[in-house]
């Protein structure tokens, strides 16, 4: 929204840790330069890499162990509390930790949650794997992808021969690609030095997300984090915000196990697309007969590292549901982000339009099913172990936090006018708000506590719509839950034996987008957790969208581009 000079001045007190990000990125570049050179410069350089691996590792370890280095990112110290990388499972198999040329499998990679927190042997093994994948699949291009505020993938495709250089130095992209809004001088956010609003940003790839795309010919993708040209993280980046909240959760002694459940609609595509001719493919009419499309999508998602637990037809014609397997850390949001792009590309191969947009009469949900575990990922902190429908005190505190902030959460999780219709779809009364409901094993509630044994004890946050940015849904959920955990007396959670929660005032969800935006602006906890810079920008963007809301006909005209 503004240039980073302003952001640094305005948010220094609330976004501690950003000062050292520039030096960390510089260290990371140096480490990548050392490790990637023997693997990617030449297909014949493998013997040189092996001969020099011991000396290279010693030098890199000495360099990376310095304060502020890439290796120090996995530290649990308080001064690093705001670093965006959650280290959920820090232990490494001896084979990978001991040898640069150890076998690497992307689907069993133990460092997949420790993004960019690699030591030299890990980084070397990962780069070797990437080189092998590029050669085996004859890759010609690599997409460097980042999410915008709406959760849409924005990318630059790089010829494969330049991949090594871009891993080290990053890919430059105009900032306006990710922050889709006119110049802040003409809007709510007006700062003195906003002239740099249209400056470039840098996409730095997270190598753990490198995958060959089965639905794109000879193309791979890597998900990127966004930085300014001076090395600071972009404070409006949804992925950065999500990582920062996960790190806060880890510092509190927990980690997040989560998965998204999405509904989406499949439309048939006539020769001319308009609001009257878009139709449903008959084969998807409350059935699973359209297997080839769904099977190709699910198999493709698996190849990109996103494991699908199940898929089925949903409640309405042409509406499908897809459920991901739970994963620790940022992976669940990465999987949802991958789905949003892959769904579109696979659908076009079948001459379909697949849309996450909520049309009149349809309720495309984006549920975040989640639980918190101890930092080692061994114990579900929501499970009482009694075999009855009951949350632990920790679980009830977390739930109390979600209820407390539900009004502000709804703004981030149902970010469009049509999204909010689902909150009152069963009511004919004209209201300004509806209660935030919760219950045990009750799918009609906004917050549904599923007690299906120890591993199945989880909270389904059903406030979200499929159009919400998955990184923001995850970040806001963690921020609200953490506030509940950190409540001083725990009175809101009630006793450990009780199933009930004590609420001084019933939680309400605003039905109007304007009221939800006001609730978000007034929620000091979420403002501090997500950053005032982000909140200021998000609110200004939504107000601009409300002022320029398109008609249904215009929306249908460009339906194939919406997700």
From Swiss-Prot:
Domain GS catalytic: 238-563
A GO term from the CC aspect: plasma membrane
Annotated Polar residues bias: 51-62, 105-115
Gene3D superfamilies: Glutamine synthetase, N-terminal domain, Glutamine synthetase/guanido kinase, catalytic domain
Biased composition regions of type Basic residues, renumbered to the chain: 26-37
PROSITE patterns per record: GS_BETA_GRASP, GS_CATALYTIC
Tissue expression per record: Expressed in lens.
Segments of this protein annotated with the region Disordered: 1-115
Residues of the GS beta-grasp domain: 137-231
One GO process term, biological-process aspect: glutamine biosynthetic process
Family (UniProt): Belongs to the glutamine synthetase family.
Job of this protein: May act as a component of the cytoskeleton or as a chaperone for the reorganization of intermediate filament proteins during terminal differentiation in the lens. Does not seem to have enzymatic activity.
Assembly: Dodecamer. Interacts with BFSP2 and VIM.
Protein name: Lengsin
